[in-house]
Amino acid sequence: MAIATRTLTKEEMNSFHSRKFFPREIKLATDGLALIVNRANPDSLLSVRDFRRILTGEVKNWKEVNPDSRLKGIQVVFDNKNSSTVRFAMDSICGGKELAEGNVSALKTNQQVIDYVAKNPDAMGVIGVNWLGNRSDTTNLSFREEIRVMAVSAEDVATPANSYKPYQAYLFYG
């Protein structure tokens, strides 16, 4: 048995099939990404389109996302350069494109991402949803207090009405 965080690619499946091995995929769980920013950052909405543009380096400054922003360059931080979070961002959000060098980097752990974002107003962190929970909230309806969780929209322009934060209920429905 093997466990993967994604579906196997055609090339991977062909490799298995050429060796007379026919893997079956079974979905065990659904996870989600969370985009976090510093508490001082007033930007709390982002479209997937703008996130893609940030990750590929097309957008590098907060003013390009929000003309009223007083922040400067966007510094995106991931948990680890080899993590499934980075892989998902490259494959599913950026359509196979490489992540931009310069304003996108990786630390070593999710906790380091949270700490970095909490200390740097220009930072945006990308972490797994399971790292967001407020430990003092037994209902699991609030997020960690040291950071702000962004709401994300599939529409080109993010608004409060079309954007969603990564609450557990949304993960349940995939």
Label every model-predicted segment:
Residues 1-31, 36-174:
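Exported/periplasmic ABC-transporter solute-binding proteins
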